Structures are given as C-alpha cells and as structure tokens.
C-alpha cells in the first residue's frame, strides 16, 4: 500500500536467473539464445528464447526483425519510406485527401479509438499537434541545455484545438484514413510499440516459436514458459525510476503469457530552470503529468498494456485503480517519494509480496 518503501525489495540476481540463464542445461532438448537489434522504435529490442539449435533460433529472429522493421516504418510519424504509406503520410495529407494504408495501420487506429472510448479519453492519438511542440522544445533543450525553455502556453492551447479524434475518419471498406482537420496530427507513440510487440509475438507463435520473451524498452512480452527445469514463469525486473539509487530493480514479477509495460517521467525528459519536464503530456492541462515516477501494467495484450500504462500515468490513483479493475489488468504505481501502491491482483506476480508473506 502507499507509504511503504520498496527499495529493500529484490536483488538483480533474481532477474538474471531466467533472463541470463546458461544455454543447454543438462537433459533439456532446447537451448537458450538471445539476439538484439537497435534499428526500430528508437529502442533496443532483444528476443530471449529457447530453440533446438542456433539455426532455428536465427530463423525466428529473422521473422521478428523483419516484422519489427516493417511495423516501425508503418507507424513512423517522422520519416517517409519509398513505397510505404505510413502515419506520416496520413498526417501530411490532413485536410487534403484520404490515404490508402495497410491493414496494420487500420487496426492500430481502430484499437486506439476503442481504448480511448473505454478509458475516458486520457490518451488521445490525435494529440500529435501538441506533442510535436513538446518534442521540438525538448530536442532543442537537450541539444543546448543552457537555452532550454518551455513552449509558450498559448501555442499549446492553439494546438490543443486540433485534437478531436472524431476528425480521424477510418474507412475499412476502402482501406483509407483521412484527417478532416488540416491542423490535426496523429501520434501513436502511446500504443505503437506495444501493439507491434503483440503482432510479432503472435506471428512467432504461428511460426512454431513457443518459449520466448520480447523486450523492447519498457515493453516486455512473454510467450509460454521457460524451457528450463523447474521454471514455470518468466522473471521480469521492474526498473527503479530513481536512476541514482543503488538498486536498479525495485521488484521482480513472475509472469507467463503476459505483457509487462512500464512508463515513467524518468525515461525521456529535459530540464528548464532546474525542473524536469518529461514527455508524457496530459491532454487536459497540455503539460507533463505529475502524479507518479512510473506506472507498470500487467496485461494479456502488449498493445493494451502500453496504452493503459500511459493512461494510468495521467490520472489520480483512485481513478486509476478503478479503471484497472474495469479493464481487467493489474498495475503498480511508484510515487515521487519512492513509495508505491498497486492493485490487489498485482501481489500474485510480485516477488516483493511473496518475500513479505
């Protein structure tokens, strides 16, 4: 419950027992492999998994990497790619014409609209006009810290007039997306990476890969159970949002066929006059949310977990707990003072509570 300190919690070695276990344990038919790449979604993506040999694992990695590249290009809001209509293409044609897009983009936007409606509208993928202002000021502030400044609030307010998700018209029959408001911009950063992880997981399972973890920044997506004797769950460490603390991990959770997503203001920010301003912007205030240091969500679906982690970060604890219950997910909130709170269901996954019971 809130008020209890968590930094006594869990040794890093507990995480390493599974995530860095030796390959080819005696008597097992499968060995553990891992591989990473850093060319998609602006983050390091690592796949840990069990396969009969390196050739088989590399085949699965080829599927994962190529699919992540494809989804990265489709969901990108900053860059054009030859022969690809992506989110940027939709934005560039706002108020001009509908854009023919892939099924993946259609489904992503439909899911974002569904979750927006079901969760009170705290996370809005039509807020790109506001988020782009914060992005530009943050990038400038990081490049020249001595000149860092906040965006003028009247600029944010003007951009905030162009965030109506109903202005994003999705036509499934024609496979097009059209933004009616010429000044509205899409930004799918609150769901795209988790959604991509879920798609890649499903396609790897369909290809025959059964026991693996995809780790993409704060998104961890698990499939099956570790092919290690005596192991029935994956052990996932939750990062300490206090990056100066001695303990890098504040809790370890045991999950199987679940996704774990953590968001926090410590991950991407810049400093103005000694104050940190992170990238998670509240659509009501047009300013960074200030309730928590981080929020972790455990859910069946990685895209849902991604979206809900940001949603819960943007609302008070009582509202967040109620929403988590309605959505059938579990969560843990870490506050500015290092205390924490969680849903009751979170305890079944937590090494902290297991050690305390």
Regions found by a protein language model. Name each.
Residues 2-357:
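Mature catalytic core of soluble alpha/beta enzymes
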């Amino acid at each position: 419950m809130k008020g209890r300190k968590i930094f006594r919690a869990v040794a890093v070695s507990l995480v390493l027992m599974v995530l860095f276990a030796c390959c080819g344990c005696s008597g097992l038919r499968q060995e553990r492999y891992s591989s990473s790449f850093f060319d998609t979604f602006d983050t390091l993506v690592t796949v840990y998994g069990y396969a009969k040999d390196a050739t088989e694992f590399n085949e699965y990695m080829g599927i994962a990497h190529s699919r992540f590249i494809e989804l990265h290009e489709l969901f990108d809001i900053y860059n054009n790619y030859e022969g690809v209509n992506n989110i940027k293409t939709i934005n560039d044609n706002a108020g001009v014409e509908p854009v023919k897009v892939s099924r993946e983009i259609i489904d992503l936007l439909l899911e974002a609209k569904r979750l927006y409606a079901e969760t009170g509208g705290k996370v809005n993928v039509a807020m790109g006009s506001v988020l782009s202002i914060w992005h530009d000021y943050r990038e400038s502030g990081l490049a020249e810290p001595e000149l860092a400044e906040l965006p003028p609030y009247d600029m944010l307010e003007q951009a905030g007039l162009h965030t109506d998700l109903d202005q994003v018209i999705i036509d499934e029959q024609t496979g097009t997306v059209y933004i009616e408001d010429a000044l509205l911009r899409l930004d799918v950063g609150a769901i795209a990476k988790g959604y991509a992880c879920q798609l890649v997981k499903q396609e790897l399972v369909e290809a025959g890969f059964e026991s693996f973890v995809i780790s993409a920044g704060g998104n961890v997506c698990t499939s099956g159970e570790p092919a290690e004797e005596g192991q029935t769950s994956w052990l996932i460490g939750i990062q300490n949002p206090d990056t100066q603390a001695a303990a890098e991990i504040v809790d370890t959770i045991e999950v199987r066929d679940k996704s774990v997503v953590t968001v926090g203001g410590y991950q991407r920010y810049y400093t103005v006059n000694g104050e940190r301003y992170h990238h998670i912007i509240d659509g009501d205030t047009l300013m960074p949310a200030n309730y928590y240091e981080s929020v972790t969500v455990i859910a069946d679906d990685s895209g849902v977990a991604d979206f809900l982690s940001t949603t819960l970060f943007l609302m008070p604890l009582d509202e967040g707990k109620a929403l988590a219950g309605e959505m059938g997910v579990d969560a843990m909130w870490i506050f500015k003072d290092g205390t924490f709170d969680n849903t009751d269901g979170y305890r079944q996954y937590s090494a902290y509570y297991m050690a305390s019971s």
